[in-house]
């Protein structure tokens, strides 16, 4: 997402920024009298301003948005109303639904078939490599147990679809790397990777709390992905039949798509313990189903969701920033940073192994390795769970999760933004 400010507006831009902080200085007023609408105004206005500023500085706009969340959040100025913070998780999920639906609407099954074996391996092998790297490095570096290292590894191993998917969609639009299905390969892997990592995380937590590392829980991973794909494709087919039979505006179709996605998320909560089912995979698969059965509509809906993403991106990354307690990042020290970078090297090695024997040349492999590094959404969602459960490694896990967001999200995004024209061929 890029913004441009002409020279004539620079003074106004500076005045707006200054005025905001002057206004925020009387924060007691906002904390006592503010409400959800005031908080949303702050989120979108300051998110736009800092996103624009960072774009001008040749840095990813999402970094400005994350910093916006840190500034507005409960650990700095505390200007966000509690009603916003209490539904932050749901709002972040809404943004994920929008971007994953866009991903599905652009993901041709034939392109994934072309990618073949690497597309399958990218769903789990890089994450396994990163967790293994953390298990090997963390006990010696930080003096923790192997199981605690596995918990930390599973927190930081998930790649962020919210960072990766929009960039891959841009590559598809510009026809960069599409001849070898590189954007589709990365996009599909980034979406499934999260499901795999979260199941491992919950398994490690149960084991740490005195339970057993159940093989059945590990079987849940492929089952939940397969069930999610089947449910999504069926839902996509039914929606196509509905849209062909009843004439309605595309905007109404977008609303229906969002409602179906929300119902799938609720369904996962209700039956997830008994029937392995990934709602986010299903959401993406709905888009895939629509593209397969009604490609003209898929392109029109993709344009609609692209416009929704303008606001959703700001909301998502500002709220991710609001979860970041900066004191944990400051306290993390050099050792935590070394662990994150070391684990990333293992992750990139995992990506390299996935691509062995593929048609990708050296430049394309380097690009894929870099594109698979950003962390944000999953770390914000699960980083604090071990601390809330009272685990000995809880504070350290949260610290490393926070630091991984601050380091990898902007670096990974910048690596993609400023290398793709050099590393990928335009078809």
Show where each model-derived region lies:
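Transmembrane helical cores of multi-pass secondary ion antiporters/exchangers
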Residues: 8, 12-15, 22-25, 29-427
């Amino acid at each position: 997402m890029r913004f441009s400010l002409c020279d004539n507006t620079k003074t106004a831009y500076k005045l707006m920024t200054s005025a905001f902080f002057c206004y925020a200085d009387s924060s007691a007023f906002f904390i006592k009298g503010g409400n959800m609408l005031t908080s949303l105004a702050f989120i979108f206005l300051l998110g736009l301003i800092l996103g624009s500023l960072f774009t001008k500085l040749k840095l990813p706009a999402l970094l400005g948005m994350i910093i916006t969340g840190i500034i507005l959040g409960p650990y700095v100025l505390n200007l966000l109303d509690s009603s916003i913070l209490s539904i932050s998780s749901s709002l972040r999920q809404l943004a994920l639904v929008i971007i994953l639906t866009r991903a599905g609407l652009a993901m041709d099954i034939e392109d994934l078939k072309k990618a073949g074996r690497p597309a399958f391996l990218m769903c789990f092998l890089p994450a396994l490599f990163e967790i293994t790297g953390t298990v090997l490095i963390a006990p010696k570096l930080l003096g923790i147990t192997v199981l605690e290292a596995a918990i930390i590894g599973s927190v930081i191993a998930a790649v962020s679809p919210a960072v990766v998917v929009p960039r891959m969609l841009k590559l598809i639009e510009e026809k960069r790397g599409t001849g070898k299905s590189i954007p589709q390969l990365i996009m599909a892997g980034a979406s499934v990777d999260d499901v795999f990592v979260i199941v491992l995380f919950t398994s490690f937590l149960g084991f740490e709390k005195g339970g057993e590392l159940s093989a059945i829980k590990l079987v849940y991973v492929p089952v939940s992905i397969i069930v999610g794909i089947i449910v999504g494709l069926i839902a996509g087919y039914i929606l196509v039949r509905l849209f062909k039979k009843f004439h309605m505006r595309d905007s109404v179709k977008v609303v229906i798509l969002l409602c179906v996605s929300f119902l799938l998320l609720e369904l996962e909560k209700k039956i997830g313990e008994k029937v392995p089912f990934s709602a986010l995979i299903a959401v993406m698969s709905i888009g895939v189903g629509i593209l397969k059965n009604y490609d003209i509509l898929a392109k029109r809906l993709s344009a609609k969701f692209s416009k929704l993403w303008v606001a959703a991106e700001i909301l998502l990354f500002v709220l991710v920033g609001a979860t970041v307690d900066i004191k944990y990042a400051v306290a993390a020290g050099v050792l935590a940073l070394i662990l994150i970078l070391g684990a990333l090297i293992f992750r990139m090695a995992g990506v390299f192994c996935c691509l062995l024997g593929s048609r990708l040349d050296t430049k394309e492999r380097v690009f894929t390795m870099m594109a698979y590094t950003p962390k944000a959404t999953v770390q914000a969602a699960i980083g604090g769970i071990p601390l809330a459960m009272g685990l000995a490694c809880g504070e350290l896990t949260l610290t490393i999760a926070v630091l991984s967001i601050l380091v990898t999200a902007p670096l990974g995004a910048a690596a993609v933004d400023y290398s793709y024209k050099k590393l990928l061929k335009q078809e």
